Design a protein with these regions (language model features):
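Cytochrome P450
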Residues: 1-429
């Protein structure tokens, strides 16, 4: 069967199924029809685990989500294979930024690759990137000072993590803007999935362009290594085994996408939360030691990744007693779990002094815990400290337009955040 016909049938079938499930009020139908995952959680909060007629389980329960995320018996790979090989022209020779990376690999193989990547993301190494982050932040804020009114996403939240992760990986500045465009496309269409043949073609072309560039950089680093992630992975080995080129390219591609997309979302939605809650902004300005906890509360209130999917490797029992068969899939609503009223008092309120904000599940747990979570937190802390230092008159911080969200269910992401503040002499501290 021609690939185009196969993908057309796939999209037609998927759309028809989602429509039917919506009409009968099935949990997966509500999943598709809900504007966001917090709304979905509120529509389905009567029981801790919902079961679709398709056999898929869905949970917004904090305990259920936490225990599944921590368990090595709930796998990422099976669903990823169904997802990314369904409509695509994927072959074993194709390098897929998601399917071939640690996000979609389980067990010993995942641990092997992650172990080789880990030296770049240790607390000591991440701490050394604070100075780089501050340098980039200062450059970005220097441009903002010239006009006062600006789009926070375009001016700060996007370019800061993009520059940091590109420097960590070893991408020459010449290619940063291309990586930005490719990363946004792959995070949007790739993670939320293409809806038609046109989006599928764009996704596959973008994936090929990014992996080709990384392949070229890898070839250069094998001859002339530098102090970056590509060079590290090119030479790293464990138990006498090195990573294959395919493993390196996929791992670097995914690190690039995840490394700036999730941090960008954290920076933008966290700043929006401050603008929408001036009492909390004033409190943060007076007590900047609260910044780390504020970051956790921002992650809780608006999880960058809204949900993840896992598959049981054997008959298992969820935290609420629900039995899952081997091969059964569960959708974990992270955004809903972060608003679970059994765990978080006043779950819809943004409270930077919330004592248990760290219980958020936004970066996951266990084997698939986000390897770059510490880097994201460090970048966020550097950015907000400098923002408050340079622009201490927080009463002048204002929205100047309506924030615009990108379409998509998996990623909570602002497209634009128009704001302004009065430029004044920055504090010395």
């Amino acid at each position: 069967m021609p690939a185009s016909l196969r993908s057309t049938l796939y999209f037609s079938g998927t759309n028809a199924l989602s429509m039917a499930l919506r009409l009968i009020g099935d949990p997966i139908g509500k999943f598709y029809s809900s504007p966001d995952m917090v709304t979905f959680a509120k529509r389905t909060n009567k029981v801790s685990v919902q079961k679709s007629i398709t056999g898929v389980l869905v949970s917004s329960n904090h305990q259920v989500c936490s225990e599944v995320l921590k368990s090595p018996n709930w796998l990422s790979r099976p669903f990823a294979e169904r997802l990314y090989t369904g409509p695509t022209t994927y072959t074993p020779e194709t390098i897929h930024p998601f399917l071939d990376s640690i996000i979609a690999i389980d067990g010993a193989e995942q641990r092997r690759i992650k172990k080789l990547m880990q030296p770049v993301f240790t607390p000591r190494v991440i701490d050394s990137w604070k100075e780089t982050s501050l340098r980039i932040v200062n450059d970005l804020f220097s441009n903002v000072k010239e006009h006062g009114e600006f789009d926070f996403v375009a001016s700060i939240a996007n370019p800061l993590p993009l520059a940091v992760i590109c420097e960590i990986i070893g991408v020459p500045k010449l290619y940063w803007e291309k990586c930005n465009i490719w990363g946004r496309t792959l995070a949007g269409i790739g993670l939320d999935l293409p809806k038609n043949n046109q989006e599928l073609e764009e996704l596959e072309a973008t994936s090929l362009a990014l992996t080709d560039l990384i392949g070229e950089l890898l070839a250069i680093r094998r001859v002339k290594p530098e102090d970056d992630l590509i060079s590290l992975l090119a030479s790293a080995q464990t138990d006498g085994q090195k990573l294959s080129d395919k493993e390196i390219i996929a791992s670097v591609a995914f690190t690039l996408i995840a490394g700036f997309e999730t941090t960008m979302n954290l920076l933008s939605v966290g700043t929006l939360a401050l603008l929408e809650n001036p009492d909390q902004l004033a409190l943060l300005a007076r007590n900047q030691e609260l910044i780390p906890n504020f970051i956790e509360e921002a992650l809780r209130l608006s999880s960058p990744i809204q949900f993840v999917v896992r598959t049981a490797d054997s008959p298992l029992v969820l935290a609420d007693g629900t039995k899952a068969k081997a091969g059964q899939t569960v959708i974990l609503n992270l955004a809903g779990a972060n608003r679970d009223p059994a765990v978080f008092d006043k779950p819809d309120s943004f409270l930077i002094q919330r004592e248990n904000a760290k219980k958020n599940v936004s970066f996951g747990f266990g084997a698939h815990h986000c390897i770059g979570s510490l880097l994201a937190r460090v970048e966020a802390e550097v950015m907000w400290r400098e923002l408050l230092r340079r622009f201490p008159d927080v009463e002048s911080w204002k929205l100047t337009g309506t924030p615009k969200y990108r379409s998509g269910k998996l990623i909570k992401s602002l497209e634009s955040l128009p704001m302004s503040f009065r430029v004044s002499q920055p504090s010395a501290f």
